[in-house]
């Protein structure tokens, strides 16, 4: 499906830009999410998570470097840069080195289809949602490469657990997203968002326009936690049982890249859940009578603002959950996936289908 | 089947409760726990808010009558070694030299007016070992050994935890030892000159037999 040109004005214009043979525009388009991930991971991801976790535990968090410890993340980066880049002697060097790379690429690739606003999307694929769900699976390869390549039993355990977990949770996650796709009648992220735009603001969102959307919404949120290895599904990492799971052996910048990938994935799933159920870049404010709040807060810049805010909200919930719940046991994890989430996602799927047919 | 649903219900409600608690703490982070010390009536009522103490900059005041770091007022020490013997962990090291009779004036008196008869060239307290049990304090006859309210005396080098209190320098101590030896030799000579046979001590009394059971 070719999207209407008005949808992608910025990214279309950018991708046409090139200096001689060099496709400068494409490079800029690719760099935008990268810069975004880096900035957000540094500020909100690392610093924010530290502060949020500290506040939830009645602590202060970093305070010494800069005002309120604001420069702590920079100090950490300097520290990581100075660290020796160790590759264990008996590790499978090739796998060990490319593991973090695959992990990062896996989370970064999905940003291609995330609409960052009504006028900017890297690639408006007509199978965008499907692509986003599928590309996450690359992460499994990265984790396996890292875990196996480390030649360390903890790392291998972590990696195997992670594969079991991610492969299992892909199922309820995908079925839950299918419900959203059914409601929209399309797999294109930009189209799904457009379906939820309107003068009523949040009233057009799938979560509020039909009575069963909360079920796939919840199921996708829970599964997305598992796919990003966030607590309470962080058994691949399991720092108290497995030291640090699949990245036990990593040091310095490789470790940093693994974390960057994790924060990238966190935003990615948060953005996907916002797009599928909460209207992506559409403004939540409704037009009330003469007060055109919705019209005022729409547009390319506002769109980027809204989707980032929605993503950040879900990241906050992920952090909030992380500092609330203990880690699940492996059997509980599988129970939750196969005996709870999967049946309920199938029920949600059928109910959504009935609802869509009757409307 | 009903257990299945009740489990789901329990999980949902318990997760909601737990998240409520953490969120409450998150928003309470704008507050600070008060800095009421342990002897404050409000100590246990400071429930909400951050509890991190940024230590070197902020410290909970220790009670003015606290008993923490051991201190020896060496001017009052009579070198009786009671504390040394009483200490369960042997963290006090004392060396004493008897003052010669012409030195008694220089040796001085304790603040209680008692004549000191010992120089104490070495009085070391290893505060790293001291467990502040206070036994030494209770046996000290001149009350010159006591715990101070200073609670924070950490050091980077454990050697610095050895506190020296002696009242003589090494050279002075040598001089005093020499002087004492000379005087003793002198006294022995005088005694010999006076004709007292050295072995003429009266035999010790036999101990009374233990009572028969
Ligand atoms: S307080 Fe106790 S441990 Fe410390 S020096 Fe005195 S007797 Fe020894
Ligand atoms: S008990 Fe007191 S007077 Fe005696 S040696 Fe110890 S500190 Fe000095």
UniProtKB/Swiss-Prot annotation, chain A:
Q: Biological process (GO) annotations?
A: aerobic respiration
Tell me a Gene Ontology molecular-function term this record carries.
NADH dehydrogenase activity
The protein's job, in short, is: NDH-1 shuttles electrons from NADH, via FMN and iron-sulfur (Fe-S) centers, to quinones in the respiratory chain. The immediate electron acceptor for the enzyme in this species is believed to be ubiquinone. Couples the redox reaction to proton translocation (for every two electrons transferred, four hydrogen ions are translocated across the cytoplasmic membrane), and thus conserves the redox energy in a proton gradient. This subunit may bind ubiquinone.
- Which membrane topology term applies here? Multi-pass membrane protein
The top of its lineage is: Bacteria, Pseudomonadati, Chlorobiota, Chlorobiia, Chlorobiales
Instruction: Provide the assembly information.
Output: NDH-1 is composed of 14 different subunits. Subunits NuoA, H, J, K, L, M, N constitute the membrane sector of the complex.
Primary location recorded for the protein, binned into one broad class: membrane
Query: Would I find Phosphoprotein among this entry's keywords?
Result: no
Keyword check for Flavoprotein, yes or no.
no
Query: What reaction does this catalyse?
Result: a quinone + NADH + 5 H(+)(in) = a quinol + NAD(+) + 4 H(+)(out)
Pfam family for this entry, one: NADHdh
Protein name according to UniProt: NADH-quinone oxidoreductase subunit H
Gene encoding it? Answer: nuoH
Tell me its family.
Answer: Belongs to the complex I subunit 1 family.
The top EC class, named as a word, is translocase
One GO cellular component assignment for this chain's record is: plasma membrane
Give the keywords, sorted: Cell inner membrane, Cell membrane, Membrane, NAD, Quinone, Translocase, Transmembrane, Transmembrane helix, Ubiquinone
- Which residue windows are transmembrane per the record? 19-39, 94-114, 127-147, 166-186, 202-222, 266-286, 301-321, 337-357
Q: Which InterPro entries is this protein grouped with?
A: NADH_UbQ_OxRdtase_su1/FPO (IPR001694), NADH_UbQ_OxRdtase_su1_CS (IPR018086)
The EC number(s) attached to this protein equal: 7.1.1.-
Localization per Swiss-Prot or TrEMBL: Cell inner membrane
